[in-house]
Amino acid sequence: MRYYVETDGRVFLVERGDRLDLPRPEEIPFPVEPIAPLVGDDVWFCVPSLDKHPRSWHHKDDLPTSDRALPEVRSAIHATMPRVVVEGLCLREGRILLVKGSRGLTEGRWTLPGGFLRFGESPEACILREIREEVGLSGSIDRFAGVRSKLGRRSRLHWTMLFYRVAVHGEPTPAPDEIAEARFVPIDQAPEMLHDEDMSCVLRGLTDRPAG
């Protein structure tokens, strides 16, 4: 068992020869709180209890390119990076647009249109792009509708989900390489169709009314 200990963008590591490695529990000279596993069950993310800022610890942003950092350190850092996705709530006359993926994490599952936020992209631009790419519809932002954050049960990644109400016109045309099916379904039926509980929770609190 090894711990990944991070605070304020700095990481506590130990030296093994000329390499930097993740510490074992007995090598940590301060209290820590284990939060969740990162890489398999052998590496856990931990929060330290400290009296002051750890100036001598290693900068997290420097470690991925450090020749001294062992691959396990780099893997742990990669696992801690939040994954940001943007989801669209496209409502029409008491119905909401759902899509069923044809590949990847959502293959064969109903979900909301949306996807990963690109580097340098705004969330608003992201969701409009994703809707256009997935179902061929142009849209306009109605309003921000909420944010959810979780640790994935299977992926063990930290997911941040941003939700936007989006007005779209026309009928969806699924992009076959990405979407197997797309349709508007009654809002009260949609939460039970979705595979993601956070999406379902957002929809259960949703009302079909204009902003203002």
PLM region descriptions:
Residues Y4-G40, R95-E133:
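Conserved Nudix-box catalytic region and its N-terminal flanking loop in Nudix hydrolases
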Residues F45-L89:
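Acidic, metal-coordinating catalytic segment for phosphate/diphosphate chemistry
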Residues I77-A79, R148-M161:
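Acidic pyrophosphate-coordinating catalytic loop
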Residues S138-V147:
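A short coil-to-beta-strand element that immediately follows conserved catalytic motifs
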Residues L157-E171:
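Phosphate/ribose-recognition catalytic cores of enzymes acting on nucleotide-derived substrates
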